[in-house]
């Protein structure tokens, strides 16, 4: 497993998905095989998304690397993640923000949230809080956030999330620009407003927003 993991990370560096050594180290530390169903563990270090139940997936490693690089996560950051899924992405971010940082992650499917919570706790990630709810509304009690990462595609960028981002903060979010076509946005909040960079076409499950 370790050898497969090292090979995957070497490939992600070679392909340009991983740029900072901190990201390589964080992904090296997190056991992705513990975040996928047992029958798929042998595929944990293939660069592919995998089903995790409840119609959801764990993102491909290259996408996790790409998103945390785009978000420019730093030690001490307070991060909001929308769409916990398996909890793998949160674990990688927890490694990057360190004990002085914190990751708040929201999942709307209670069984996935519970499983992620148990897994993260068992692995000693005390700097992650798993919440159940509608992630498109964010989590105001801990706002504002240095970084917000959304792992499901929105029809438009939720206003609540923009409000909960600090000035100087970064949000990385897939947006469905037209039916069947999603683009990953990097949004930087400035004192005047927002700077939006369109990064690349992506394919995520839809962000479910409760009315």
UniProtKB/Swiss-Prot annotation:
NCBIfam families: pimt (TIGR00080), PRK00312.1 (NF001453), PRK13942.1 (NF010549). The keyword Cytoplasm applies. GO terms for biological process: methylation; protein modification process; protein repair. The active site is at 59. It is found in: Cytoplasm. It catalyses: [protein]-L-isoaspartate + S-adenosyl-L-methionine = [protein]-L-isoaspartate alpha-methyl ester + S-adenosyl-L-homocysteine. InterPro entries: PCMT, SAM-dependent_MTases_sf. Belongs to the methyltransferase superfamily. L-isoaspartyl/D-aspartyl protein methyltransferase family. Catalyzes the methyl esterification of L-isoaspartyl residues in peptides and proteins that result from spontaneous decomposition of normal L-aspartyl and L-asparaginyl residues. It plays a role in the repair and/or degradation of damaged proteins. SUPFAM superfamilies: S-adenosyl-L-methionine-dependent methyltransferases. One of its GO terms (molecular function) is protein-L-isoaspartate (D-aspartate) O-methyltransferase activity. Gene3D superfamilies: Vaccinia Virus protein VP39. This is Protein-L-isoaspartate O-methyltransferase. GO terms for cellular component: cytoplasm. Keywords: Cytoplasm, Methyltransferase, S-adenosyl-L-methionine, Transferase. Its EC number is 2.1.1.77.
């Amino acid at each position: 497993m370790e050898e497969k993991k090292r090979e995957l990370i070497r490939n992600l560096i070679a392909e340009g998905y991983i740029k900072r050594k901190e990201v390589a180290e964080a992904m090296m530390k997190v056991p992705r095989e513990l975040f996928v169903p047992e029958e798929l563990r042998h595929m944990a270090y293939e660069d592919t998304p995998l089903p995790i139940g409840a119609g959801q997936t764990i993102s491909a490693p290259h996408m996790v690397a790409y998103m945390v690089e785009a978000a420019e996560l730093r030690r001490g950051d307070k991060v909001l993640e929308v769409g916990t899924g398996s909890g793998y992405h949160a674990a990688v971010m927890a490694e990057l923000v360190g004990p002085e940082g914190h990751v708040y992650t929201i999942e709307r499917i209670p069984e996935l949230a519970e499983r992620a919570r148990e897994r993260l706790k068992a692995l000693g990630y005390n700097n992650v809080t798993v919440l159940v709810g509608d992630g498109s509304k964010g989590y105001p009690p801990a706002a504002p956030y240095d970084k917000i990462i959304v792992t499901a595609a929105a029809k438009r960028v939720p206003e609540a999330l923009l409000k909960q981002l600090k000035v100087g903060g970064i949000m990385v979010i897939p947006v469905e620009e037209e039916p069947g076509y999603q683009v990953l946005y990097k949004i930087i909040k400035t004192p005047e407003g927002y700077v939006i960079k369109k990064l690349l076409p992506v394919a995520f499950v839809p962000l479910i927003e409760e009315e």
